[in-house]
Amino acid sequence: MVLLKWLVCQLVFFTAFSHAFTDYLLKKCAQSGFCHRNRVYAENIAKSHHCYYKVDAESIAHDPLENVLHATIIKTIPRLEGDDIAVQFPFSLSFLQDHSVRFTINEKERMPTNSSGLLISSQRFNETWKYAFDKKFQEEANRTSIPQFHFLKQKQTVNSFWSKISSFLSLSNSTADTFHLRNGDVSVEIFAEPFQLKVYWQNALKLIVNEQNFLNIEHHRTKQENFAHVLPEETTFNMFKDNFLYSKHDSMPLGPESVALDFSFMGSTNVYGIPEHATSLRLMDTSGGKEPYRLFNVDVFEYNIGTSQPMYGSIPFMFSSSSTSIFWVNAADTWVDIKYDTSKNKTMTHWISENGVIDVVMSLGPDIPTIIDKFTDLTGRPFLPPISSIGYHQCRWNYNDEMDVLTVDSQMDAHMIPYDFIWLDLEYTNDKKYFTWKQHSFPNPKRLLSKLKKLGRNLVVLIDPHLKKDYEISDRVINENVAVKDHNGNDYVGHCWPGNSIWIDTISKYGQKIWKSFFERFMDLPADLTNLFIWNDMNEPSIFDGPETTAPKDLIHDNYIEERSVHNIYGLSVHEATYDAIKSIYSPSDKRPFLLTRAFFAGSQRTAATWTGDNVANWDYLKISIPMVLSNNIAGMPFIGADIAGFAEDPTPELIARWYQAGLWYPFFRAHAHIDTKRREPYLFNEPLKSIVRDIIQLRYFLLPTLYTMFHKSSVTGFPIMNPMFIEHPEFAELYHIDNQFYWSNSGLLVKPVTEPGQSETEMVFPPGIFYEFASLHSFINNGTDLIEKNISAPLDKIPLFIEGGHIITMKDKYRRSSMLMKNDPYVIVIAPDTEGRAVGDLYVDDGETFGYQRGEYVETQFIFENNTLKNVRSHIPENLTGIHHNTLRNTNIEKIIIAKNNLQHNITLKDSIKVKKNGEESSLPTRSSYENDNKITILNLSLDITEDWEVIF
């Protein structure tokens, strides 16, 4: 019943919405030459059952120094007359240290093209991994002779090839054309003809590569010889031209270059990931003529909902509910088809990229968190942001001048609405020239920053990679030869906010250096002013007169790299260069940067937050924001939110209230509005809306200790902050379809925002166990072994929010104007026992703003409640605790403990005193000022330091 209701709601939602974005600007698969060709090829191969790719068994070699298996894949093109054509593709396969499997298929080095004046490399781009993988892997790669990556450290010399066995890798052949590799719990079978891989976890088949024989690599050929190089199942549609209206000038200097491969996820009919798309968390089936999912960073103002169209960011990472994942390491335009086969309990996927190489990392494990952990270990952990940046952000396009900013600042205080960041959009600049200030509006930025700093507040300004022609900054970019070039080698000029613009080439190392120098001058501030941060928008890149709202694919970057090859990592290169600049500038204070990017790729989580882009103030966009934020969270980039309460158009009061109630749970909590909308700072609202929004924002601040602990967990393991229910309860099949209700990390906080108008109640899904309504701590129990649905009251001023039994929440419950002013406040512990009377919770504390935590300057502890006793069990304290405590950690005391009550045998009652064990001594503490009601016990006036081990016996 739960699943049926969800499916009905999804059908109504996605069919009722009227599209806002102009669809005709973006290609459909049938209009994309390489997508159409590969779909046709797949359809024809499925009918003919032919296979043209095989492993040359004689080429297989295993270098014990590298622990990498090398081979050659042969593509045979049959000819009616003369000899068949054979094309060679070098293949490598190896294991990462976490037992993930990486394989690559490249094209044997191409002969230089005969085309005169070619300004790009004729070789396939094989360096996406250098942008996507974390530096620790890149550094390891650079210490070896392997051009891609050094995976295995143990070395062993043996006499016979088939006896090459190490503790990492065992290799054998069981038949003439089948080879077996094993690494811990993971094993791989390589089938030579037709080429195929089968990947096993603990001897269970989890993934089949090329099961459908969709492998297709459009090898290099000239237009004149093309006819002889086409397979019978192929079409020649748009191989050497692009007839799409908005990209018909693409010179396509290397002709067809696409790569494609199919992957079958066994034992699962649920797959997730490949953000960013405005659709359901569980990826849609795209068979039967539907559009594939597209990964291609573009500017989609008022994007369409319920479609597989591309958006601002791309993370080519997908996993199944059977805890198996693939990471398609390719930054080119990419399409992904998905087909669920419930009769065989498997999911078939088809990945198609315009060019580059096939570079895939396959991970397997016991559960989905392990898969996400492996992915973020490879691509880099999400950065630990300043605690201020997980507070509330107030933004609009635009705050007009310094007085406008300071008026917002003072009015927020006057109405007791906390906030930490205020933002300046495009109009703060002088004539839309980045790295400048509009002098009559912001005559003294240092003065403005100083005033904001008094209460610990921060300013974010917009700086985009497009630079107005003919001013100092763009002139230097041109003079230093670090502008992106057109296909003729001239500085590319396109249209964006300033009019005619050029684009900085941050793919270039020297371009990054020049970009950094601009920030060094722009952020030349007194040493004590470290509260200016940056927003990189429009970095897909967005080009108003460009094809599909973005860059022509035949633009040229440094080192003869074509835009076609690196499109989806351009935005990452921009924001990483910006992050490095800010980090360097603030290094004397050791301050952590905060940075927002609109475009992203795998690895962007290392340095930036993001948001869902230019949404609209209506209920459909509120509803879709939840699966969108969830999708990024499970794909390794958790620091994301959506513009509250819609960027474009004016929201109703009801929508504002409901959107703040949903936005409270976004990891990135920002209100933003278009320049043409009415002002909607929270203090301008009429009652009761103003009080509702104020209370929501205050609740976010009360929960900052728990939220910051979640961010720390994510920075260590990649664990989602907004967390799908199926990750916490994978045993229930129905939860794999739920994306309108979620947990906050592993805290036990379970929430379902109201996303439809006129609702005063909602249906929530609860697994077995006890749940406590957050505000009252009133409890109810699901005594069964299955999920139940329960009708929950949800008037406009109430969030459907529960604590799952077995968890402990840490809070600070005093109103302060910003997060900095909360540092000296004590903690409040909320204990929600499970049906056995137990509960556990974690707390992480550092200074919230510097990199001191990387030097061990933090406290990490776990609260354990059982047998009516609360224990504090520290897992880490700083070596120099006294100095660190005084200067950075500030107040580490627990002042109040709240224990939720229930009607079970483990329930407790308030006694005249409690016992405290600390430092080997036991004392009795009176509870005269404490109190009790039907739902909870509140114990006050405590002084329990989280940096010490102690027990409290109730």
Curated annotation (Swiss-Prot):
Metabolic or biological pathway, per its Swiss-Prot or TrEMBL entry: Glycan metabolism; N-glycan metabolism
Q: How is its activity regulated?
A: Inhibited by glucose, maltose and nigerose, and by the antibiotic deoxynojirimycin.
Identify the main location.
Answer: endoplasmic reticulum
Q: What else is known?
A: Present with 238 molecules/cell in log phase SD medium.
Family matches, as PROSITE patterns: GLYCOSYL_HYDROL_F31_1
Reaction catalysed by this enzyme: N(4)-(alpha-D-Glc-(1->3)-alpha-D-Man-(1->2)-alpha-D-Man-(1->2)-alpha-D-Man-(1->3)-[alpha-D-Man-(1->2)-alpha-D-Man-(1->3)-[alpha-D-Man-(1->2)-alpha-D-Man-(1->6)]-alpha-D-Man-(1->6)]-beta-D-Man-(1->4)-beta-D-GlcNAc-(1->4)-beta-D-GlcNAc)-L-asparaginyl-[protein] + H2O = N(4)-(alpha-D-Man-(1->2)-alpha-D-Man-(1->2)-alpha-D-Man-(1->3)-[alpha-D-Man-(1->2)-alpha-D-Man-(1->3)-[alpha-D-Man-(1->2)-alpha-D-Man-(1->6)]-alpha-D-Man-(1->6)]-beta-D-Man-(1->4)-beta-D-GlcNAc-(1->4)-beta-D-GlcNAc)-L-asparaginyl-[protein] (N-glucan mannose isomer 9A1,2,3B1,2,3) + beta-D-glucose; N(4)-(alpha-D-Glc-(1->3)-alpha-D-Glc-(1->3)-alpha-D-Man-(1->2)-alpha-D-Man-(1->2)-alpha-D-Man-(1->3)-[alpha-D-Man-(1->2)-alpha-D-Man-(1->3)-[alpha-D-Man-(1->2)-alpha-D-Man-(1->6)]-alpha-D-Man-(1->6)]-beta-D-Man-(1->4)-beta-D-GlcNAc-(1->4)-beta-D-GlcNAc)-L-asparaginyl-[protein] + H2O = N(4)-(alpha-D-Glc-(1->3)-alpha-D-Man-(1->2)-alpha-D-Man-(1->2)-alpha-D-Man-(1->3)-[alpha-D-Man-(1->2)-alpha-D-Man-(1->3)-[alpha-D-Man-(1->2)-alpha-D-Man-(1->6)]-alpha-D-Man-(1->6)]-beta-D-Man-(1->4)-beta-D-GlcNAc-(1->4)-beta-D-GlcNAc)-L-asparaginyl-[protein] + beta-D-glucose
> Looking at the record's lineage, which domain of life comes first?
Eukaryota
- Keyword set includes rRNA processing: no
Relate the assembly described in the record: Heterodimer of a catalytic subunit alpha (ROT2) and a subunit beta (GTB1).
Family matches, as PANTHER family:
ALPHA-GLUCOSIDASE (PTHR22762), BCDNA.GH04962 (PTHR22762:SF54)
Q: Where in the cell is it found?
A: Endoplasmic reticulum
Q: Which species is this UniProt entry from? A: Saccharomyces cerevisiae (strain ATCC 204508 / S288c)
Top EC class of this enzyme: hydrolase
With respect to pH, the record says: Optimum pH is 5.8-6.8.
Family (UniProt):
Belongs to the glycosyl hydrolase 31 family.
Query: How is this protein named in the record?
Result: Glucosidase 2 subunit alpha
